[in-house]
Amino acid sequence: MAIHTLLFVSLLIFSLIESSSGGKKDRLFTDLQNSIEVTAKPVKDSGVLEAGKDMVTITWKLKSSSAKVDTDTAFKTIQVKLCYAPISQVDRPWRKTDNKLFKDRSCPHEIVSKAYDKTPQSLDWTIGLDIPTGTYFVRAYGIDGDGHEVAYGQSTDEGRTTNLFSVHAISGHHVGLDIASTFFSVFSVVSLFVFFVMEKRKAKLEQRE
């Protein structure tokens, strides 16, 4: 009986998940209107940017040349993301581009998500410490009231080959970890020494008896 109940609950949860995500599964990137103008300019003049240190100035606004300038009336939120360029997707299926938005893995790093403002927006973004080494561009999505993407814009061309920038990730070497490692090493040595002294004292007491 318990097994049947568990199976029923599992199927119910699965069906609820499917129904809630069904709308997103039908949405294709090629159906979105390219009506947002996005730029991404590293503050550093040249060279590879360092994660956790260097900054990128990002701007976005509705394209004035858009055939449907009123498309922004559907926007409730603007979501800006950092996306992998094709060169950083080679042999990395977990970063693959897919026309089905719910399957697309090319833009996993959210930079900012905020209420839509019709006036041109700008952001000086410091590259996060969690950003891996790679080549990137920036993409912005216009999100409607139901949480669906209805428009987009990106800082590169359609082939994602221009206006790219490269990031070098931190090595993962932290002073805090070194201190912790040293502390535990010393603690282990001291503990071993104390254990040795106690055992030796115990042996002497046994000999006297």
UniProtKB/Swiss-Prot annotation:
It comes from the Eukaryota. It is found in: Cell membrane. Keywords: Cell membrane, Membrane, Nitrate assimilation, Signal, Transmembrane, Transmembrane helix. One of its GO terms (cellular component) is plasma membrane. The keyword Membrane applies. The chain crosses the membrane at residues 177-197. GO terms for molecular function: nitrate transmembrane transporter activity. Pfam families: NAR2 (PF16974). Residues 1-22 form the signal peptide. It is a single-pass membrane protein. GO terms for biological process: nitrate assimilation; response to nitrate. The keyword Cell inner membrane does not apply. Bearly detected in roots and shoots. Induction: Not regulated by nitrate. Belongs to the NAR2 family. Acts as a dual component transporter with NTR2.1. Required for high-affinity nitrate transport. This is High-affinity nitrate transporter 3.2. It comes from Arabidopsis thaliana.
